[in-house]
Swiss-Prot record:
Gene source species: Citrobacter koseri (strain ATCC BAA-895 / CDC 4225-83 / SGSC4696)
Catalytic activity: tRNA(Glu) + L-glutamate + ATP = L-glutamyl-tRNA(Glu) + AMP + diphosphate
Protein name according to UniProt: Glutamate--tRNA ligase
Motif 'HIGH' region in this chain: 9-19
Protein's UniProt keywords contain NADP: no
Binding site for ATP: K240
Function: Catalyzes the attachment of glutamate to tRNA(Glu) in a two-step reaction: glutamate is first activated by ATP to form Glu-AMP and then transferred to the acceptor end of tRNA(Glu).
HAMAP family assigned: Glu_tRNA_synth_type1
Record keywords: Aminoacyl-tRNA synthetase, ATP-binding, Cytoplasm, Ligase, Metal-binding, Nucleotide-binding, Protein biosynthesis, Zinc
Cellular component annotations (GO), alphabetically ordered: cytosol
Organism placement in taxonomy: Bacteria, Pseudomonadati, Pseudomonadota, Gammaproteobacteria, Enterobacterales
Length: 471
C-alpha cells in the first residue's frame, strides 16, 4: 500500500507555527515511507477565505521546502463532485432532506439545554413522513447510525471511542446548495486516496462523523493521528506574545528555515536525546509512535539558539542566499565590500538572526555619516591621535593585504608605542566601523579594505583635531 498524507489548511489567515508543524509531520511521514504528500486548500468558507491567505500558505510551504507531490487542490473547484455524491446518498437513503426552520431548531436547542441534555437534532425529517414541495428550502443531513459506536486507533493517542448516540445527523449540504466542511473532507480523502490523516487534536470530534460517512460510502477509512496543541512556555494557549506568528514572519525576523523546521519537529517528537536534526535525519527517524500526546511548550529562546547554530554550521554560501533578502530590505549596496558568504563568517558568532546581521553590517559597504557618540567620546580622544597615525602608516605600507598582515600592523604599533593592544585597537575599531563593537579587528579591517580603512582613520583624526580645537 502506498502511503499518502495531506496537509489541508483553510485559507482564512497565515500559515502559523501549529499548521506548519502539522504539515511537517505529514510531510515527514510520507517521505519516511516513500509515499506521497498532498496539499489541499479547504476554502469552503467563502466569506473568510482570501487569495492573500492562500498565497501566504504557499509562501510558507515553499520557504520551508515542504514540497508537495499533488495539488494544490481547491475544494471550491470540486462542488460538482460533492453534490453528485450527496445526490447518490439521498438515493441510497444514507442522507435525507431536512426542512426544519431555524426557529424550530433554536427552540429545540433551548428545550434540550433546559433539560440538561446535549443539543442535537431530533430526527424529525429523517423518515420523510411530511410532504414538501421540490422548491421548498432545505438542508441535507447525513443519516448517522443510531446505535453502536465508532472506534478508531489513533496513532498518537491510542483507541478512541464515540457512541453514535452522541453524534448528530450532520448537515452535509446547506440551503444554498453548498456542501459543508466535514463532508468535503471525507470525499476529498476518499478521492485522493489518503491513507493517513495527521492533524491537530481540535479535529478529534470530527473524526467519528467522518468515519461514519466514509463507511456509508463504502470508502476505505484512513488511519488517524491527532497532534497535541502547542502552548506558550507559561502553559497558556499559544498567542502572538508567545511567538504564534506566521511562518513568513520568522523569515522576516531573520530565521533560517532549517532552524524553524528543527524546532518544530521537536515540538512533540523526539529521538533519544538528539536536539539537532538535518532534514535527512528527520525523514529517516520520524515515526508517529514517538510523537507525544502531551501539549508542547513554545520557547522562543530555544528557537533563537537553534538559529544561531545553523547560521554558523551551514555552508556560508547557503546562509548568504537567505541573508541577501535581508540585505535588500535594508537597502544596502553590497557591490563595494566583502562577499556575503564572507560576511556570514565574520558576523556569524555575533549575530543570532540574519536580520540582526543585515542591520549591523552596513559599515562594511557604506561610509557612515558620524561616529557613535558614546564610542567616540570614550575612544576618539587626543590621546588616541598618535596610535591612529602610526597604525594608519603601517597599514598603508602593507603590500599584501591580508588579515594576518593587518594584525601584525596593529601589534607593531602597540610595540612601538609601548602600549597595550587596546590603546591601539579600540580607537582603530571606532575609526573604521563608527562604533565600539565589531568582529575581530584584523578581519574587520581586512574586509573593509585598505583604502577605505585609511580614509576612515583620517576622518577619525580630523574628528579628534576638531574636538581638541573646541576644548
Amino acid at each position: 500500500m502506498k502511503i499518502k498524507t495531506r496537509f489541508a489548511p483553510s485559507p482564512t489567515g497565515y500559515l502559523h507555527v501549529g499548521g506548519a508543524r502539522t504539515a511537517l509531520y505529514s510531510w515527514l511521514f510520507a517521505r519516511n515511507h516513500g509515499g506521497e504528500f498532498v496539499l489541499r486548500i479547504e476554502d469552503t468558507d467563502l466569506e473568510r477565505s482570501t487569495p492573500e491567505a492562500i498565497e501566504a500558505i504557499m509562501d510558507g510551504m515553499n520557504w520551508l521546502s515542504l514540497e508537495w507531490d499533488e495539488g494544490p487542490y481547491f475544494q471550491t473547484k470540486r462542488f460538482d463532485r460533492y453534490n453528485a455524491v450527496i445526490d447518490e446518498m439521498l438515493e441510497a437513503g444514507t442522507a435525507y432532506k431536512c426542512y426544519c426552520s431555524k426557529e424550530r431548531l433554536e427552540a429545540l436547542r433551548e428545550e434540550q439545554m433546559a433539560k440538561g441534555e446535549k443539543p442535537r437534532y431530533d430526527g424529525r425529517c429523517r423518515h420523510g413522513h411530511e410532504h414538501h414541495s421540490d422548491d421548498e428550502p432545505c438542508v441535507v443531513r447525513f443519516a448517522n447510525p443510531q446505535d453502536g459506536s465508532v472506534i478508531f486507533d489513533d496513532q498518537i493517542r491510542g483507541s478512541i471511542e464515540f457512541s453514535n448516540q452522541e453524534l448528530d445527523d450532520l448537515i452535509i449540504r446547506r440551503t444554498d446548495g453548498s456542501p459543508t466542511y466535514n463532508f468535503c473532507v471525507v470525499v476529498d480523502d476518499w478521492d485522493m486516496e489518503i491513507t493517513h490523516v495527521i492533524r491537530g487534536e481540535d479535529h478529534i470530534n470530527n473524526t467519528p462523523r467522518q468515519i461514519n460517512i466514509l463507511k456509508a460510502l463504502n470508502a476505505p477509512v484512513p488511519v488517524y493521528a491527532h497532534v497535541s496543541m502547542i502552548n506558550g512556555d507559561d502553559g497558556k494557549k499559544l498567542s502572538k506574545r508567545h511567538g504564534a506568528v506566521s511562518v513568513m514572519q520568522y523569515r522576516d525576523d531573520g530565521y533560517l528555515p532549517e532552524a524553524l523546521l528543527n524546532y518544530l519537529v521537536r515540538l512533540g517528537w523526539s529521538s533519544g536525546d538528539q536536539e539537532i536534526f538535518t532534514r535527512e535525519e528527520m525523514i529517516k527517524l520520524f515515526s508517529l509512535n514517538a510523537v507525544s500526546k502531551s501539549a508542547s511548550a513554545f520557547n522562543t529562546d530555544k528557537l533563537l539558539w537553534l538559529n544561531h547554530h545553523y547560521i554558523n554550521s551551514l555552508a556560508p554560501e547557503y546562509v548568504a542566499t537567505h541573508l541577501q533578502w535581508h540585505i535588500e530590505q535594508e537597502n544596502i549596496d553590497t557591490r563595494n565590500g566583502p562577499q556575503l558568504a564572507e560576511l556570514v563568517k565574520l558576523l556569524g558568532e555575533r549575530c543570532k538572526t540574519l536580520k540582526e546581521m543585515a542591520q549591523s553590517c552596513r559599515y562594511f559597504y557604506e561610509d557612515f555619516a558620524e561616529f557613535d557618540a558614546d564610542a567616540a567620546k570614550k575612544h576618539l580622544r587626543p590621546v588616541a591621535r598618535q596610535p591612529l597615525e602610526v597604525v594608519r602608516d603601517k597599514l598603508a605600507a602593507i603590500t599584501e593585504w591580508s588579515a594576518e598582515n593587518v594584525h601584525h600592523a596593529i601589534q607593531a604599533t602597540a610595540d612601538e608605542l609601548e602600549v597595550g593592544m587596546g590603546k591601539v585597537g579600540m580607537p582603530l575599531r571606532v575609526a573604521v566601523t563608527g562604533a565600539g563593537q565589531s568582529p575581530a579587528l584584523d578581519v574587520t579591517v581586512h574586509a573593509i579594505g585598505k583604502s577605505r580603512s585609511i580614509e576612515r582613520i583620517n576622518k577619525a583624526l580630523a574628528f579628534i583635531a576638531e574636538r581638541e580645537n573646541q576644548q
